[in-house]
Amino acid sequence: VSWRAGSCHEFADLVVYVMRALGIPCGTDYMAMRGDNNVPHFWNFTLDKDGKTYITEFPDPNWKRAVSMYNPKAKVYRNTYGLNWKDVKRQQGKMMHPAFRKPLYQDVTAVYADSLNRDLVVSSDILCKEVHKGDIVYFCLSTRMDWVPIAWTVFEEDSLRFQDTEGSVIGCLATWNGKRLVMQSEPFTYDKMSGTIALLTPQSEKEDITLYFKFPLFCDLGILRMPGGVFEGSNDSQFRSADTLYYVKQ
């Protein structure tokens, strides 16, 4: 707290401590992976007298309706203290990815996606390897050079159905062999408005491109916090003695 630093997860934990100390019910919702970045995201929620979800997240101190969250998210979960027994029964004792082995969460995607909430239905035609009926298949989002599972379903005869999802993401399907994810499809775009997917199949021809930004600049919180910041240099790895190299004025 004194350093005013930390991740969104740590900030959400702090808000929970403060709210509960004041007698106000509060918890944490999260995306296992953002659709527009390479990291998960956590924030706080509370419920009004009608059971509607209101949220707050850094740096906005105001509370707003959950449906107003614009971030591409695919899936949203709510941290719980007890096991989600519905998911436990669905697993039927099968080998699961560690992220879903002990489901201490509730799926609240529909609360956030509202009218855009839909089941993602994928034909088995896009699977590039053999998957058997009853196998667990994961819907994954990317994180830098890897993939992270954010939802799972059981493979039926000729299709996969991931319940309660929102689009505007790039995903991929995978299975889990007990040690690592095994990719089972080409990456694909998942459109939020239509619910359709489009495979991103590698082409034989290559094209050179120039990238000017490492991350998108839209609503970049780092930019807003730069003024007043400094770049420092030091010969000491602990920075006990440091020189200011540059001061950010604007």
Model region roles, listed by residue range:
Residues 1-100:
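Hydrophobic/aromatic-rich core segments of domains that either
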Residues 49, 157-179:
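Short Pro-Gly-centered beta-turn/loop motif in secreted/extracellular proteins
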Residues 92-119:
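Beta-strand-rich domain onsets/edges
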Residues 118-130, 211-217:
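A short, amphipathic beta-strand motif
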Residues 144-159:
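Short, acidic Ser/Thr/Gly-rich low-complexity loop/linker segments typical of extracellular
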Residues 176-204:
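Structured interaction patches on ligand/partner-binding surfaces of diverse proteins
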Residues 198-226, 231:
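Compositionally biased low-complexity segments at domain edges in trafficked proteins
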Residues 225-250:
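Trp- and acidic/polar-enriched beta-sheet ligand-binding modules for extracellular glycan
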